[in-house]
Amino acid sequence: MSDYKSTLNLPETGFPMRGDLAKREPGMLARWTDDDLYGIIRAAKKGKKTFILHDGPPYANGSIHIGHSVNKILKDIIVKSKGLSGFDSPYVPGWDCHGLPIELKVEQEFGKPGEKFTAAEFRAKCREYAATQVDGQRKDFIRLGVLGDWSHPYLTMDFKTEANIIRALGRIIKNGHLHKGAKPVHWCVDCRSALAEAEVEYYDKTSPSIDVAFRAVDQDAVKAKFGLPGVSGPVSLVIWTTTPWTLPANRAISLAPDFDYALVQIDGQAVILAKDLVESVMQRIGAAEYTILGTVKGAELELLRFTHPFMGFDVPAILGDHVTLDAGTGAVHTAPGHGPDDYVIGQKYGLETANPVGPDGAYLPGTYPTLDGVNVFKANDIVIELLKEKGALLHVEKMQHSYPCCWRHKTPIIFRATPQWFVSMDKEGLRQQSLKEIKGVQWIPDWGQARIESMVANRPDWCISRQRTWGVPMSLFVHKETQELLPIERTLAAMEEVAKRVEVDGIQAWWDLDPKEILGEDADQYEKVPDTLDVWFDSGSTSYSVVDARPEFAGHAADMYLEGSDQHRGWFMSSLMISVAMKGKAPYRQVLTHGFTVDGQGRKMSKSIGNTVSPQDVMNKLGADILRLWVASTDYTGEMAVSDEILKRAADSYRRIRNTARFLLANLNGFNPATDMVKPEEMVVLDRWAVGCAKTAQQEILKAYEAYDFHEVVQRLMRFCSVEMGSFYLDIIKDRQYTAKADSVARRSCQTALYHIAEALVRWMAPIMSFTADEIWGYLLGEREKYVFTGEWYDGLFGLEENEEFNDAFWDDVRYIKDQINKELENQKANGIKSNLEAKVTLKYADDANGTIKKLKLLGEEVRFIFITSQFVISEQAGGIDDENIQYNAGNTTVQAVVTRAEGDKCPRCWHYTTDVGKVAEHADICGRCVSNIAGNGEQRKFA
């Protein structure tokens, strides 16, 4: 017997079966860097329509975690897919470099500013620390395969950016949005600084819950309001609070104007509280017997005065819309220095904004003898004892409730009125204009719109001043006596002068500045404001300080901001506020948010639980492309689950896609697209169907990329590789590829299809599996650019026409019939028919057969290649189908498949069973078809 292996067209490629990504990817990255791939892409896309995804700056502190990876990979997928869609999509990564976390790190190592180092030296240490953090994070982001201008990122501590942040504040001042006030702000006593909304987290805390009686100053006047002069005992208004430490700052009691308030007689006294809460309050204070003497509307009690239980002054009853019946007594303890609602109502009534608490959280001297110098959280017990002594405490109990805490220290914070600078939400219509602008933005997912609308509608003025060392200075001058801001025109001119100096020397230029250099003779009357800007102002102003300033953005506004869902109250909010305050318009056209990462059981990532997934570990074990594929295949609109098992599934999907690509490349062995391409009209019908299948898949994949629906991209890609190609087309063509004459139309037609499919597939993969796409690109044939990322989606696909006889609908039916026959072939393994090629299939049909069955007959001898059997007979069954073997419906036609053993002998070359093996003397071992392919003109294929 001759060895016919050398006569076969066996697949061959240098593209490895195993990805071995962890080892190969670093080498590819080195080539990308050496070639300046990002620069090559920018040059290739020059002059195209722009798409700008503006990078929200991560904080320059610590190693990147899995959430960072999700964020950067999603951005990279979008930027690369936009490039393939014909856009010039520059990506400039950034970092947030000022602020408290960096200060704390430097303090831990070197001490507080002014101890071992001057403030100037401390800032230099902070700058140095931030730079090292940026370098560390940058290496990891690059390792993820994220393409961007990593050599020229933006840092909020860049001198030019710092200067532009000052200029942004100047524009906001010019537009009338800045004001100064002693308003209550979130205050962390550990940071000794105000906190932004986005720096506040909520945790459960146990606090004392107390009911306190404020005795009426004019008892008769209060009784008269209820028309009950003969009430027994004193009358008091009862408040409820969970922050007893704020009582020294109480300046009023708020009532709802339309609620009914009851005068209730209990043991030897009468108390006033909301009628609807009488029963719950009486149960709470243990009053088994009580009588409601009368009721009046809250409005009737306005401006009646009540004695503070221990502070020695009286306070008014006032009316406010913030009073509810959800809990308490319906009478709200009001301390304008310790709460935003209290402050607003206090302004309306001209109340004092009292703040008896220092920056360290201790009462200031002169507050109250037993409270002076005591930390407010330790003062609750002292206040409760005071109330007991004064006979004003009706009830005390412990309750657990959600309480605001510092994001950095995880410790409870307080509201504390301090002199601060604010961006006003309403003075110049910032709130209304922002709400208007929100409606013009596309929010993805769409629930993001309602979320940020609610936040903007309800947020207080934005406190932008901080009492920190490492931050952009506000660069303002105020009068030493009046504390009034330098006149507006002079303020703006002075700020520009400061900005010019900062542009050269950084923020230290402000602290080194002698006011005389700018203010001249007036310097004696004015002093520099020592405050720095909230870091959310730094990052929030990047639409101006970065996007407007970078030449590659060419004056275009950002098309997209993309961050985690917590940024509605963070970067999306601050960016919106600043852009609208400066320019009257939103800084973005689209805002996309992704969920947080959780483990396989849906639990939050936590080092203490030990369920964190390190992106560095994943890249070192599996490779970045597996991490990228996991991100793309996960629905980012909700929580994103990740675990070793989930990543293993991503690796399995990756292998299926890689194997498909390898099959395509291996079977393009010996194909030259310049000389061997077959014209579409001359191709085998099945090959044209396969190219058309790729065309349909491409339309759906591009639509999904356009909608940022990346898990749909992956699902469609998998369906194409596994179902349409792997289990149908690629399986069928193996016989033709391997056994047909090497340069026959039958084989070249197939290779033409594989070439077109490979050209499309590598581009679909590129935004997601960037390393693997680059690797495949290097093995593709024909003249091409060096990198897949510089081109666009493949435009050489075509398909079958709908009016053709063997159109897509026909092949859909064929795939269905093939699936059913494969099930029967599987069943026959028990009867000794071990492989499809050992089988003969007889397809019987009734005389009412539909067009698909009749068309199958037209395929003649080629039909067996579709079903991968040695023989395939289609036979009309007179009198209908019996119930023997398998029956199923194919397009309203009942057909029956009968599987028997194939006739003849096995050909050692093609492995088909046939009755003509050995009929040609010169090739006595093989079948006639193989003889033709070796020594003759080669078999002709028209359909399959």
Curated annotation (Swiss-Prot):
Keyword field contains Cytoplasm: yes
Cofactor(s) needed: Zn(2+)
Positions of L-isoleucyl-5'-AMP binding: E563
Family, per entry: Belongs to the class-I aminoacyl-tRNA synthetase family. IleS type 1 subfamily.
HAMAP family per record: Ile_tRNA_synth_type1 (MF_02002)
Complexes and interactors: Monomer.
Cofactor note: Binds 1 zinc ion per subunit.
InterPro entries in the record: aa-tRNA-synth_I_CS (IPR001412), aa-tRNA-synth_Ia (IPR002300), Anticodon_Ile_BEm (IPR033708), Ile-tRNA-ligase (IPR002301), Ile-tRNA-ligase_type1 (IPR023585), Ile-tRNA_ligase (IPR050081), M/V/L/I-tRNA-synth_anticd-bd (IPR013155), Rossmann-like_a/b/a_fold (IPR014729)
Residues given in the record as Zn(2+) binding sites: C907, C910, C927, C930
Native source organism of the sequence: Salmonella paratyphi A (strain AKU_12601)
Domain free text: IleRS has two distinct active sites: one for aminoacylation and one for editing. The misactivated valine is translocated from the active site to the editing site, which sterically excludes the correctly activated isoleucine. The single editing site contains two valyl binding pockets, one specific for each substrate (Val-AMP or Val-tRNA(Ile)).
GO cellular component, one term: cytosol
Keywords assigned by UniProt, alphabetized: Aminoacyl-tRNA synthetase, ATP-binding, Cytoplasm, Ligase, Metal-binding, Nucleotide-binding, Protein biosynthesis, Zinc
Function per UniProt: Catalyzes the attachment of isoleucine to tRNA(Ile). As IleRS can inadvertently accommodate and process structurally similar amino acids such as valine, to avoid such errors it has two additional distinct tRNA(Ile)-dependent editing activities. One activity is designated as 'pretransfer' editing and involves the hydrolysis of activated Val-AMP. The other activity is designated 'posttransfer' editing and involves deacylation of mischarged Val-tRNA(Ile).
Compartments reported by the entry: Cytoplasm
Residue positions binding ATP: K607
Protein name per UniProt: Isoleucine--tRNA ligase
Motif annotated as 'HIGH' region, chain positions: 58-68
Key word Coiled coil present: no
Catalytic activity: tRNA(Ile) + L-isoleucine + ATP = L-isoleucyl-tRNA(Ile) + AMP + diphosphate
Catalytic activity, EC: 6.1.1.5
An example Gene Ontology molecular-function term: tRNA binding
